[in-house]
A protein has these predicted regions:
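Ribonuclease/tRNase effector modules and their secretory precursors
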Residues: 1-134
Length: 134
């Protein structure tokens, strides 16, 4: 797929993918997923439309959307969705922001981004779903 920040096409669905970061060893250790450090994390061209459904939750939607790579690379908290199919990167920006990355055998892809209320965040933290990221 193209280099960081470049879009490349998927012939199957006509979705273009862009690199937004890489999977760190710390993320692997924290979530126990079976992937290798340094694997590229992509976002599909179809995701912004999906994610924009949550735009009213954000003080600055476009600014936060443009920080997805930073959220993945330097989250404050990390966890795994209970269904085991995605990693959740949480960063405390203007809002508690969650970026979910789908765990797939062939590719790691951003699935969604949305805010977390303080109540929801604290419940998930208390249940052990999230842990502080190094």
């Amino acid at each position: 797929m193209g280099g960081r920040g470049q879009w490349s096409r998927s012939s199957r669905k006509r979705i273009r993918y862009k690199s937004v970061g890489t999977l760190s060893q710390s993320a692997i250790d924290a979530t126990g997923i079976n992937h290798s450090a340094g694997e590229t994390i992509y976002i599909g061209s179809d995701r912004k439309g999906h994610i924009s459904k949550h735009k009213d939750e954000f003080t600055d939607f476009n600014g936060t959307y443009n920080r997805i790579g930073e959220i993945i690379g330097s989250p404050d908290y990390i966890g795994k969705h209970p269904n085991g199919q995605s990693i959740e990167f949480v960063k405390r920006l203007e809002e508690n922001t969650l970026v979910a990355v789908r765990i797939n055998q062939s590719k790691l892809t951003v699935r969604t981004m949305h805010t977390l209320s303080e109540v929801t965040f604290n419940k998930r933290l208390a249940k052990g779903r999230y842990r502080r990221y190094n």
